[in-house]
Structures are given as C-alpha cells and as structure tokens.
Amino acid sequence: MKYVAYSREDETFSEFLDQLKKQGPDVSLVSAQFSDLDDTRCRLVLDCLLDLWGQVASQPSMYGRSMPGVRYLDFSSNHIQSFQASGLVQILNNNRLLSALEIQANELGKAGTEDIRAFACAMKHCSLRRLNITANRLGDAGLATFIDHLPDTGTSLLALHLSVNTFSTDTGSWKAAHSIARFLSSPKKCRGLKSIHLNGNHFGWEGVRAIAHAISGSRRACEATASSLVDLPPSILDAC
C-alpha cells in the first residue's frame, strides 16, 4: 500500500502534485493535513486523483491488485469552504474506489446550503464507507440540508461523523435535530449505518429528546454518540 502525504516543510505544493502523478494508480492513501489547502488547491489535488481513478477504472480487472487506487483521502485541518468549488462533489460521481473521506476541521458550510445540498445528493453516486465532516461550519440549516438530501434509498456509509457543526442559539439547533431524528427513523435512508457521531452540537433538550426517541424506536443497531446522550435519565425517553 503506497501512502503519499504533503508536508509544507519538506516540499512545495507543486512537488507534491508531481509526486502524486509519478506514483500513479497504485497509491491507496493520500493525506494533506494542516497544509493550508483552500478550494483552489484542493481542486488541483482532486483533479490529479480523478485522473488516477480513471486509470484504474479503465482496467477493472486490476482492482485491489497492482493498481488499488486511492481508497483513503484525508484533507483535515485546512481552509476548504465549498464542496463544489473544491471538487469534493465531483469526485463522488461514480466513484467506486474511494472508501474514506476525512475533511474535518475545515470551513465547509460557508458557501451556503445549495453547496451542501449538492454534496449530499452526490452521496448516491459513490461507495464511501466513512465520511468525517466534524468541526466544520454547516450550522443548523446546513446540517439539516445535508441530512434531508441524502438519498432516500440510503448510502454505503458505515460511519458518519457530524460533530461540532452547529452553534448555540436561543432555540437550539432544532431544525438539524429533527432532520437527524427523521433520518434515523428511516430504515432505508440509514441502512447499513453502524455509527453516527453528533457530539458538540447545540441541539437543546428538545432536539436531543427527538434524536433519542428516533434511536430507541429504531430496530437498526446504530451506535450514536450525541450531545447529552451519555447517561440519559430514563425520563428523556418518555412519550411526548
């Protein structure tokens, strides 16, 4: 398994791109953490990866053998603001190779709810098993938009990380909490999901209660870590 990582201390951004191209389609993990990646630079990296994925897709008999393709992508702790401008939406289109996408601690959400909606809708075209959007700036409306526009028939996700994405308001993140509750109540939309991480969001007691009811009422084995869901008093699950 080949691993390619970008370090600003050891190489320039151009050298990193050249290294990716030279390694070819046998690279399986790419990391560019704490690299000051903005939308433009992220797009340049992803354009390079699209070419590598295309090389693997042109020879399907080589999947997992001499040309595994990039399966794990980590762009954590950067300055990415837009799912579309950065190329994150485009890389999901018919991508059956990428299985883990780590984009926590960026600035995603700044481009607005339509940008978030485009990313959520693109989830039906890929085979992602793990998606980490922790500590971005989706906000209440943005988080609700993401959840509401995930495909009705479900995704391939096993783990979904959405912690620390909403901000304290007078009413709490009520819209996001109810969208999450509806999502967890749908056997189709959350099919296959093993864990969803929601801690650090400002759902308020009413929001937490709605999510807790959805979890307790669902027959799916879904492990959840959510704000205030540790050691919940039994009364929180009482009928409304």
Task: Give residue ranges: language-model regions.
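Leucine-rich tandem repeat or coiled-coil scaffolds
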Residues: M1-C240
